[in-house]
């Protein structure tokens, strides 16, 4: 838990002049006033984007994603050193797969193992940035057309396309990250254009080789990771 506070603080420190995140009023890891590390942040008006998306017409949805991409591009404007991304994803998939191996048939297991042989090729073209890393509608606050982003405790340095894996998955399972109240209102047909809007307004994504294959790899990575948890 303390590590996540530090991760979130690092993100705030890297985005001090960003008006699309809550203000960080105080961060204290000294444990002088309390036995815990704590932070005090701005309370935002509005509600998560899940409460509004299903009510929007398609023009409003497109404009919302356009505005969101401008915010995310600002997050991604800092360009850190990269690392062997393919190796990281391969190792994590293999490790998680081994832990939940019994959940797969031998045929399914073999398909996943064989697909990993392509990771070096598909995950070679990388543009690294400090990403939010948990970007879904429950972490996007909407208030009178204004968007703000919350919850930075999973942020990390990674390729920019990895940022959008959850929004990509909304095309098929839009309810996945919604709360119990909003879950029933999330329908795939309301998300059918979300990926196209993302690519339209974050132009650099279109320059990444094997983008669609990469998103499928991230889906495998995410699914096996969640299977291991639950």
Annotate each PLM feature.
Residues 32, 48, 140, 157-159:
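Conserved protein kinase catalytic core
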């Amino acid at each position: 838990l303390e590590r996540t506070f530090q991760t979130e603080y690092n993100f705030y420190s890297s985005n001090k002049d960003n008006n699309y995140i809550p203000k960080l009023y105080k961060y204290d890891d000294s444990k002088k006033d309390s036995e815990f590390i704590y932070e005090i942040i701005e309370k935002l008006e509005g509600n998560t984007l899940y409460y509004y998306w299903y009510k929007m017409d398609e023009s409003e949805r497109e404009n919302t994603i356009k505005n969101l991409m401008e915010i995310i591009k600002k997050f991604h404007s800092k360009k850190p050193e990269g690392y062997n991304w393919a190796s990281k994803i391969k190792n994590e998939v293999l490790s998680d797969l081994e832990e939940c191996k019994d959940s797969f048939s031998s045929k399914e297991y073999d398909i996943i193992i064989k697909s990993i042989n392509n990771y070096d090729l598909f995950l070679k073209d990388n543009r690294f940035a400090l990403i939010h890393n948990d970007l879904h509608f429950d972490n996007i606050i909407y208030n009178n057309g204004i968007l703000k982003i919350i919850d930075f405790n999973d942020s990390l340095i990674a390729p920019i396309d990895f940022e959008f894996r959850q929004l990509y998955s909304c095309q098929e399972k839009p309810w996945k990250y919604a709360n119990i109240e909003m879950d029933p209102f999330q329908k795939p047909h309301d998300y059918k254009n979300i990926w196209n809007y993302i690519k339209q307004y974050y132009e650099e994504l279109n320059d990444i080789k094997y983008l669609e294959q990469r998103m499928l790899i991230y889906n495998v990575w995410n699914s096996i990771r969640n299977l291991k948890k639950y």
